[in-house]
Amino acid sequence: MKKQRNLRSMAAQAVEQVVEQGQSLSNILPPLQQKVSDKDKALLQELCFGVLRTLSQLDWLINKLMARPMTGKQRTVHYLIMVGLYQLLYTRIPPHAALAETVEGAVAIKRPQLKGLINGVLRQFQRQQEELLAEFNASDARYLHPSWLLKRLQKAYPEQWQSIVEANNQRPPMWLRVNRTHHSRDSWLALLDEAGMKGFPHADYPDAVRLETPAPVHALPGFEDGWVTVQDASAQGCMTWLAPQNGEHILDLCAAPGGKTTHILEVAPEAQVVAVDIDEQRLSRVYDNLKRLGMKATVKQGDGRYPSQWCGKQQFDRILLDAPCSATGVIRRHPDIKWLRRDRDIPELAQLQSEILDAIWPHLKSGGTLVYATCSVLPEENSLQIKAFLQRTADAELCETGTPEQPGKQNLPGAEEGDGFFYAKLIKK
């Protein structure tokens, strides 16, 4: 039996690690969830994701409610108060329970002397909630995005930035990819129906299913047997443009965690696939995905800027480059991105993408296809990146995705309920 732990203090410490230390929630949360009971796992996730999604609002409120910010060793208390405010604002937890558990969290973080302060701040919010929220809703903080990102979105999308921000602040739907080597989408939807769950097919992507209500993977028919994979619809769109064929040599570059590697093999089971990623730790996820789906690929650790180190002079029929990016298209799914990224990261990422594109292009066969994809919505990483590549690469030709002046296809967050994603299909003359 798991030891009873204070979830509010655990959530506060996790959020502090993201915001103050730049750690990714996807690395922090799973080990924490192993320490709590199954029924508490979902609440811990909700508190962490929710606080990060609404961080700027909670920060704004604390600055209004407290004369001085909590600093130094007491900084965790700042995040504990955030967790308390989030519960009062956004959950159905009874206020008395939310307050009691949050105040008790001070003991868990070894700050019992501050229980009275935490209780006082949260009760003050309850008394002043109406006027505080009215003031907040008239401020720029209401967009729940850092100012640097808001400015970039406003510049790139003068007509659409508000809908992008709104989509980023929503909870994401759960999308699945049906493994066509086991089931047609319709036959798997029938199995889902028999299991008492409802799903909806995507209009454009033939393997994509959206669940009416998110569910744990072990409840999905055939998940352990590889019948279905969790993957956003927009990520599945890569296969529309890559169009892999049996017998081809295909490179999946920046492949971890392996969702697109396995999708290639579902579409073209007899393709020879090489999956490469720079992060050796994340490559373990590629192996796990291949094993669950019963598939084989050549998996290598390597830097996309130096392909000769891991593939010699080998050339490929098709290359999928899911480039390292700001991930600004998947904020609704990973709200910590808003607080992990910095404005200075964007030109650095654009430079890295440019170097990888230039390095991998010679490894594409004449007549071959390269699909450049990102989960970003920023032009510097997307259309401007491809436009510059086309201008300096004489044997590269844009195919089916946009125009040379405005290359690529940009999906915005929430469009057809998918994530923000960019694709450009390039052919080697």
From Swiss-Prot:
EC identifiers of the protein: 2.1.1.176
The reaction(s) this protein catalyses: cytidine(967) in 16S rRNA + S-adenosyl-L-methionine = 5-methylcytidine(967) in 16S rRNA + S-adenosyl-L-homocysteine + H(+)
Record-level GO cellular component terms: cytosol
Entry keyword set: Cytoplasm, Methyltransferase, RNA-binding, rRNA processing, S-adenosyl-L-methionine, Transferase
UniProt-annotated location(s): Cytoplasm
Amino acids binding S-adenosyl-L-methionine: 254-260, 277, 303, 322
Annotated active site: 375
Domain of life: Bacteria
Pfam family, one: RsmF-B_ferredox
Iron among keywords: no
GO BP, one annotated term: rRNA base methylation
GO molecular function, one term: rRNA (cytosine-C5-)-methyltransferase activity
Family: Belongs to the class I-like SAM-binding methyltransferase superfamily. RsmB/NOP family.
Function: Specifically methylates the cytosine at position 967 (m5C967) of 16S rRNA.
UniProt-recorded name of the protein: Ribosomal RNA small subunit methyltransferase B
